């Protein structure tokens, strides 16, 4: 028999750096989960990915136990890492912060496609390019 799910919590947590401070502590505390047990388990599982922000789905069960699934970093984080920028543009239609080619966007889409709502690689590439555009990263011809 499966456990009864009480709550599903979505958080973005830096890999290997979970701690009881907000936003993790209040979200898990409200659900009655042992916060330190989650932090230790999460940090142990994500130690190798240090530096990345990971979207995490935490499933809380009726007996206050939990399980979690980590996904690939958000497309915006992957773009910032690939282009070596700290953040996107504040005014993306006027100030461009970097340039990207379609093949670079395709590489990011290949890495992220399992977490995306896209039917194929071409659609995933277009999603990555849309995110890049909204961050002030310009598409250039190859």
Swiss-Prot record:
Xref: CDD domains: Ribosomal_L11
Q: What does the entry report about post-translational modification of this chain? A: One or more lysine residues are methylated.
Superkingdom of the source species: Bacteria
Tell me if Ribonucleoprotein is a UniProt keyword of this record: yes
Q: Which Gene3D superfamilies match?
A: Ribosomal protein L11, C-terminal domain (1.10.10.250), Ribosomal protein L11/L12, N-terminal domain (3.30.1550.10)
The record's listing under SMART domains reads: RL11 (SM00649)
Report if keyword Metal-binding is assigned: no
Q: Name one GO biological process term.
A: translation
Q: Which GO terms describe its cellular component?
A: cytosolic large ribosomal subunit
What keywords sit in the KW lines?
Answer: Methylation, Ribonucleoprotein, Ribosomal protein, RNA-binding, rRNA-binding
Q: Which GO terms describe its molecular function?
A: large ribosomal subunit rRNA binding; structural constituent of ribosome
Stated family = Belongs to the universal ribosomal protein uL11 family.
Q: What does this protein do?
A: Forms part of the ribosomal stalk which helps the ribosome interact with GTP-bound translation factors.
NCBIfam families given for it?
A: L11_bact
**Subunit info?**
Part of the ribosomal stalk of the 50S ribosomal subunit. Interacts with L10 and the large rRNA to form the base of the stalk. L10 forms an elongated spine to which L12 dimers bind in a sequential fashion forming a multimeric L10(L12)X complex.
The entry's protein name is Large ribosomal subunit protein uL11
* Species of the source: Protochlamydia amoebophila (strain UWE25)
